[in-house]
Amino acid sequence: MTGRQREREQRPQPQTGDQGHPRRWLILVALCAALLVIVIDNTVLNVAIPEIGRTFDASTGELQAVLDSYVVVCGGLLVAAGALSDRCGRRRVMVAGLVVFGLTSAGAALAPSVWWLIGMRAAMGVGAALVMPATLAIMVRVFPPHERPKAFAAWTAVGSVALGLGPLLGGALVDLWSWAGIFLVNLPFVAVALAGVVRLVPESRDPAAGAPDLPSTVLVTTGMVALVWAVIAVPERGALATPVLAATALAVVSLAWFGVRQRRASAPMVDFGLYRDRRFAGASSAIALIAVATGSTLFVLSQYLQLVRGHSAVVAGMAALPLAAGSVVGSALGARAPARIGYRACIVTGFAVTAAGFGVLAALGPDSGQPHIAFGLLLCGFGTGFAGPAATSTALGAVPADRAGMGSALNDTHQQLGIAFGVAVLGGLLSTAYRAFLPTGVPHDASTSLAATLSFADERTSAALADAARLAFTQAQSATMTAGLACALAGAAVAMLSLRSGRRAPSR
């Protein structure tokens, strides 16, 4: 650390009070740049999934692991990372996370096998875990309560732009270069985000924060990794297979031990008392459920567009634009709507619209056109965008200021675990249903994914089998989207039953 940096950190920061930090909107720009790095990486990967599957001859389970290794590790470390940022400084931890993310992105681009890629994705999850809690904690600190919905809406809108930009960029890189380009493109984004964070974001910390609990971090991460792996492995190995049962047992023991440690700790990583607040518990549950619903959407549709409809990666990437556009518009309206119709009404309405979008996507057939897909994704994006600012404000507004790092980390954890289980559970449903709808007589190795079946059919010049495989995937996709619809409606029901109506900005 240079003398100038040390002097800047030691200099008293302006108090936020009711007016907020005087540079809060510039700070938000820097935080959104960091968010952009993380979201683009996740969305860019979905478009490359079919190409990665062909390159490494990967099964559906291995492709799920490529996505989930990042999400599960990130989710498992978020709470510890939040505690670390509270103790060591939120800006410092964010900078470290961006550096780790950039280095491991380069390592992923050089992957010689699918398991190397899975390992690098897990390491990227470490970097993302260091970045995410700090962003929301800093936003809560520099923005007064009445401006937070606007700030969260801008934050959500940037994520939505990345949601549209990522697949389009990824498709171009895959078509013009290779899947490795989707990881190398992270490097310039990381450099820009680092410059903005170092230059604009003030340092902040909680003087009373304790050291991160390493044993508890290991327990919760191990438990979640084991549980998600067990769910992913069920379609290929069976629910009663020894490895699946062993992973499930490891998950139960690890997570139970984690819970016991937290209840006995004088300064726990997770304050379970937060969940006694209906606002925090209700909003967090709703956020997790909508993440389950939406987590596998692009994973599934990318394969549908490229392997069933025969589109290029660029065209598949363009299909995500309505999702992003809907989310941007929804976020803009959702930032102002709580003051007019209330926070609960915003969440319930948004999730209901998202459920309608899944209903449209569940009706897709092998020959459905782009307008059908675009309309479904537009509804999904608008609904989640409209509900997002109210849900985030409600959850974080229930957290005391001195627990901002923990609260934002838990908020991110609920989202990441929702996405992880969405990919694992709904991806598992896709895989199981696909096998069930395939004609009898297809060898096991050829039924592990649509790409594997199409390759098998091509070797035997069987156009009939290829057509049957595409139909089977479309039917399995409909089952998956119907499950997403159910999750979105469940999120709306949780918000309706657990949250109170009202238009006041949530605050503790």
From Swiss-Prot:
- Segments carrying the region annotation (Disordered) are 1-20
Pfam families (alphabetical): MFS_1 (PF07690)
State whether keyword Cell membrane applies: yes
Could you tell me the keywords of this UniProt record?
Answer: Cell membrane, Membrane, Transmembrane, Transmembrane helix, Transport
Q: Which domain of life is it from?
A: Bacteria
Disulfide cysteine pairs (residue numbers): none
One GO cellular component term? plasma membrane
Q: How does it sit in the membrane?
A: Multi-pass membrane protein
Query: Which cellular compartments is it found in?
Result: Cell membrane
Skewed-composition ranges (Basic and acidic residues): 1-11
Q: Which residues cross the membrane?
A: 25-45, 65-85, 98-118, 123-143, 154-174, 178-198, 214-234, 240-260, 280-300, 313-333, 345-365, 373-393, 417-437, 479-499
Entry annotated with the keyword Iron: no
Instruction: Mention one GO molecular function.
Output: transmembrane transporter activity
Which family would the database say this protein is a member of?
Belongs to the major facilitator superfamily.
**Name the record gives this protein:** Uncharacterized MFS-type transporter SACE_5813
